[in-house]
Amino acid sequence: MEALLASSTIVGLVLMTIPAAASSSERTTSAGSIANVPYSLILEDQFLATLHYLPVSFVPAVHRPAPTPTTTTTVPPTTTTSSSTTTTTTTPTTFSASTSTTLATSTTLKPAKIIRHDAKWPAALSRRNGRFVWRFADLPAAFRSQWHVGTANIIVVGALMRFQNVHNLPVTGNMDTTTWLTLLRAVLARQYSPTSYNFVYVQEALPEHLTLYQNGHPTFSSLVNTGIAVSPTEIGTHAVYLRYTSQTMSGTNPNGTHYSDPGIPWVSYFYGGDALHGFIRSSYGWPQSLGCVEMPFVDAQTLWPQTPLGTMVTVQ
């Protein structure tokens, strides 16, 4: 794997934070305090999807009221011996309950405990009945298979990293108190993601190449080189966690010799020492690197602005 070294222009850092206690200043409308909203994975999914940080949308269920029962009431006679009737209706008091949360692919989730809204927090922050559906039809199956409702999967981790980065929070991909309260405020303020949903798909089938998807549409492609057999690129879906405009890469070759390559441009790390970056080769499209995904300088420069922290990278 290609090592991380100090001679670099750093753009993003991954920092770990300890969740802090909620501040008494975290108050909102008279409907209640956002500090009272209990965290759950389902709510995290719902809010990140609502703000367009996920490749899925949350579609609230359409409320269909139950049929109104009809009763017949006999009106006492007044001046005659005959009786007349009139029809009246009564509407019983009911409470809606969630039954399940479903994916468009018919993957179902067992019902979670229902959080019934009360005055402790704004109604907009209560869990709602509904389902999650894919926003984009053309995303590869290898990527789509990573999404599961109500789990800390890599797609949710990447979305949370992206949210943290946009809101100038430490980018950990982990939920903490500060991130949760910031997410709740963003939902109330309808602060949607300011960028398109970007995804990088690296295919090792020859000739090796990558494709950039923006909001589900392929917008850019490049021939690339992935890792050789003794130092392969990590297969799977990962999140960009560290970026440099330029870096000196140094480490040890498989034969034990040392290497040091200064001025490696447009670097986006997505798994350990594996990164997307520019590198000069006589040809591209077949395994040549020590784990990174190499491409021509000009292509790396085009791709780099579209791979902010939290961007998903699938290697297949």
What are these regions (language model features)?
Residues M1-Y259:
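Cell-envelope/ECM-targeting effectors and their regulatory/trafficking segments
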